[in-house]
């Protein structure tokens, strides 16, 4: 993978190493022949799709890999690099074919999906709405036991991986560097830096 050890490939809203990852639903193997057949059956063997990305060098490199891989199936991906604030506005307005963006991640799995794929969620740029997904997310949110929550998340994952309102690609691994003079630094799984307790000697 282009980002190497700095990220973990994934197909769900949490990484495969996360205890809430639904292991019976792993990353599927590529099937170029099936993709071509589906496009032909749809009457659009060579669709043109504009992929909006933010102007980060890493995003451009990954978008170019997506472009090359999709071309094997017949897609003509046009990359549109857009300044971050403008890209967010285009996304909020629904003014895009496909939008490659990232989410910082939250410690609780609910924070990685409810605000993005809930029917009336603030970051639901794709305007996805599945009432059953909403019900299952709400049910999982009210539980503490992991096994019970996983049962609800399994149903959610089955819907998301079937409907594909989002195609998850990878989960970044948070890397930090600091001077030896800094003490009290604690890395958190969501990547957010908490300044409480930090001391510079």
Q: Where in this protein do the model-derived segments appear?
A:
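Detector for C-terminal structural segments
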Residues: 1-20, 57-67, 87-201
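Short beta-strand->loop
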Residues: 24-25, 29, 50-57
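Short, well-ordered beta-strand elements
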Residues: 46-55, 77-80, 97
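Short secondary-structure junction motifs
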Residues: 11, 46-48, 74, 164
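Early extracytoplasmic/lumenal segment of secretory-pathway proteins
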Residues: 76-89
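Conserved functional loop/turn residues at catalytic and ligand-binding sites
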Residues: 43, 74, 95
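Immediate post-signal peptide segment of exported/extracytoplasmic ligand-binding proteins
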Residues: 32-50
